[in-house]
Amino acid sequence: MLSLRQTLATAALLLASLPALAASNSPVGTWKTIDDDTGQAKAIVQITEHDGVLEGKILQVLKSDDGPHPICKKCDGARHNQPIEGMTFVWGLTRDGDEWDGGRILDPKSGKVYKASMQLVDGGQKLKVRGYIGFSLLGRTQVWLRTEMPEPASMPAASSAPMSPQAGDAMQH
């Protein structure tokens, strides 16, 4: 028979493991984006959830042809010429079974906004992110890797310009 101390210790371990289990069933967290052409890491991004809707922000650009702190030269509206680091580039995704769909994703390099879907794979350690026009068959997929949050000293200050998801909705393709 288990003692009270053993029972409490077991319960504490189970409770402590719940956040890790929840994280593996949700895209919420920090991800390293991988370029689907080169296979190289491009950025560290943070996916958050507000009222069942996912949003993604670029925390740190790791590789850019435009220097260490690139701006979105080809973006329209409020994002035009704004720093890419700190920018909301994914918005509006809601859960549909085992994937998140119905949102938009911005390609900061081209300035184009695409429809988006996401699906966790490999026990929640990888995230398949698909950007597409019209039907999901007409698009590209990247696989992102779950990672740790970068140190605050290595991250740039977020832009003070408003970057509401609605600004990108006008750019539907």
Task: Specify the residue positions occupied by each region the protein language model found.
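Central antiparallel beta-sheet cores of small beta-barrel/beta-sandwich binding domains
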Residues: 33-116, 173
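Cleaved targeting-peptide boundary
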Residues: 23-31
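Compositionally biased, proline/threonine/alanine/serine-rich low-complexity intrinsically disordered stretches
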Residues: 152-173
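Bacterial N-terminal signal peptides that target proteins for export
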Residues: 1-11
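Surface-exposed interaction patches
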Residues: 99-143
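Short beta-strand-to-coil "C-cap" segments at the C-terminal boundary of structured domains/repeats
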Residues: 143-151
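N-terminal signal peptide c-region/cleavage motif recognized by signal peptidases
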Residues: 17-19
